[in-house]
Amino acid sequence: ETVYDPGNGQADGSLIEDFIEGGNVSLNTADYIYYVTLGGGSNGENGLKTITDSNFDLWTDGNVATPTADGAKYTPSLAEYTSNRSLKRDQVEADDNWEYVGVFAEGAGGTDPAIIQNVNDQGMVGVVMQVSDDTLPRGAVITEIFNNWLPAMFTTTAVEAEGKATSTWAALKADR
C-alpha cells in the first residue's frame, strides 16, 4: 500500500492528505517529499503541490543551510550542510494557508530542516535534510525534533477549575 497513489490521481482525500488535515505531522528526509511512491511511481514536483494544495516547489540545488537559533536549541546534532530540496521561504510566506512553525537551518535558497503548518487544520509538513548524502546525521536530527521541538509545540496549559461550568454545576448540585 501507499499513502499517496502514483501520478497524482488523488487531488483530495488521499491517506496522507487526510492525515495532515487531521492535524498530524508528516516529515520527509533524503530527497523531494512526496515525489516517488510505492513501486517507484513518480508524482514529480506535483506530489507536494497536490497534497498541500499549494504551489510549493523544492528545486534548491546547492542551498547551504546554516543552523538557526532554533536549530542550535532544538537540534544540536545539526551542522551546516548543503540541501538540494529546501522549502522556499517566499513561497511559504506568500501562501495564506501555510506558515512556518519551525526553521532549524536556512540558506539563501530556502529552509531545511523546516516545518510548516496549515493555518486552517493545524496539520504540519516538514523536510529534514533533503539531499542524497548518507553521511548526514538525519536520524539524530529527526530524533531531536521529536524529543526537543515537538513537545515544546504541544505543551498543555493547566486550567483553574474554580468558576468553570463543571465546577459551578457541581457546587449547585452539592448545595441541593
Predicted regions and their residues:
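Structural recognition of the beta-strand scaffold that forms the well-ordered cores
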Residues: 1, 25-29, 102, 124-129
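Short, structured coil/loop segments at alpha-helix boundaries
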Residues: 8-9, 13-16, 62-83, 138-143, ...
